Amino acid sequence: MARFQMSNLVGDPFALATVSIGMLAWIIGVVSCSIAHTKEVVPNFFWWSIAYQLCVLVGVAVVMGSNTSHIYGTAVVGYAAAGLVCTTFTLDSLVTSKQGARQSAGAGLILLAMTDIVWIFYFGSTSQSGPRAYIDSFAPHKEQPHSYRNSKPISHSYTPRPETTVSSAHPHMYSSAPLSGFETSSPMTGFNPAAASTTGLQPVLGSQTNASTVGGETGEVGQPTEYPYRAKAIYSYEANPDDANEISFTKHEILEVSDVSGRWWQAKKSTGETGIAPSNYLILL
C-alpha cells in the first residue's frame, strides 16, 4: 500500500499550489462566517458545506501525497463535484449580503469552488492527455507516458519474440530421428508402404505436402483458449506496425495472460483482441 510522503506534496507545484489555496480559502470562509454568525444567524447548510470541503481538501492532499491519483482519481472527481454543488448553493446568500463578514466568507467559498473545478479537470483527465502530462512534468516523482521505442525499461539485450509456427512449437513433428524401423514421419493419412515399394515411390521428408496440412488442418498454431492470469499494464505500449502479432495497450489497462514463462506473454484485451506483449510492461495481479 502506498504511503503518504510530504515530499510528494511539496515536490509537486500543482499539488502544493491547489491544496494551499484551497486551505487558505477554507480558513477565510470559516473565520469570516464565524464573525458574521455573532451578528446574524448563518444558515446551517453553510456549515455543512464548509465541513464537507475540509474532507475534500484532506482527501486530495492524501491522494497527492501518496501519489495514488491514478487509483483514486475517479473518486476525487465525484467528491469534488459534490463539493462544487454545495459551495455554489451557499454562495448566493453570502455574496448578496450587505454584511462585510458574509461577503468575505463568500469570497473564500468562491476560491474553494474554483479549486474544485481545477481538481475535477485534473483528476478527470488521463495521464496521457496533453494538459495533465504538462502539469505532471513539473513533478519528478510522477511517471511520464512511455513509448516502447523510447522507454528505458527495454534493454538492448532483449530477446526476440517467440516463433509462432509449427516447426518451433513441435520441433520433432517432421523429423525421423524419434522414429524407428520402417515408420515414416509424414503426417499424411492413408499412406501404404507396400504400395510405395511396388511403384518405386518414396515419401519425401519435409516436403511442401507434408508440412502443409495435418488431417485437413492448417500448419498455424491456434491461439490459447485459456487465460488463467491477469496482469496490469504499468506503462503504455504501442505495437510495432510491421508485426501483426503484437498488441497495443494503455497504462493501467488490465489484460488476461495465458503464459508467464517468457519475455513475451500471450495476452488478451477486454475487447477480445489477442497478441503478444512485453512482460516488463506488465505486472501480475
Swiss-Prot record:
A Pfam match: SH3_1
Chief location: membrane
Region (Disordered): 141-170
InterPro entries: SH3-like_dom_sf, SH3_domain, Sho1_SH3
Residue ranges with Polar residues bias: 147-168
Membrane side Cytoplasmic: residue ranges: 1-12, 66-70, 125-285
Domain SH3 per the UniProt entry, residue ranges: 226-285
Family named by the database record: Belongs to the SHO1 family.
Protein name: High osmolarity signaling protein SHO1
Cellular compartments per GO CC: plasma membrane
Membrane topology: Multi-pass membrane protein
Compartments it resides in: Cell membrane
Role of this protein: Plasma membrane osmosensor that activates the high osmolarity glycerol (HOG) MAPK signaling pathway in response to high osmolarity.
SUPFAM superfamilies in the cross-refs: SH3-domain (SSF50044)
Spans within the Extracellular topological domain: 34-44, 92-103
Keyword NAD (UniProt): no
TM helices/strands, residue ranges: 13-33, 45-65, 71-91, 104-124
Keywords, in A-Z order: Cell membrane, Membrane, SH3 domain, Stress response, Transmembrane, Transmembrane helix
Quaternary structure and interacting proteins, as annotated: Forms homooligomers.
